[in-house]
């Protein structure tokens, strides 16, 4: 079936005059212009190995968690759970792990545990078993 041209024009005017609800932003124009968090959307990030996909996604997840109190379930089959936790800790503190005091690690990891759940990758799970 073909798109109804009248409806298409109406949608374009809705976009032009900001009548379409926007996803959550980070208040960074250079990011928000291209990427917003939309609840219920399913996004996939693909690319060659060792190009920074996981790092970028974790950074964005941390930024959205800090700004909007979002919570995440992370499955990353190519990365260990402790390497994910380390990146999250370093992103949250802005400090390499070797320079973070133990007491701060304890506090920050409580917050991280509240906002990020990591799926162990030592075996495969069904969607039902994760719920």
Residue ranges and their predicted role:
Residues 13-20, 41-44, 86-90, 94:
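Short, mixed-charge, low-aromatic patches
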Residues 32, 67-131:
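Cytosolic-facing regulatory segments adjacent to core modules
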Residues 43-46, 73:
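Short hydrophobic/aromatic beta-strand immediately N-terminal to the Walker A/P-loop
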Residues 56-60:
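Hydrophobic positions on the alpha1 helix immediately C-terminal to the Walker A/P-loop
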Residues 49:
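The conserved Walker
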Residues 1-39, 110-113:
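Core recognition of P-loop NTPase motor domains used across DNA-transaction enzymes
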Residues 52-53:
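Conserved glycine(s) of the Walker
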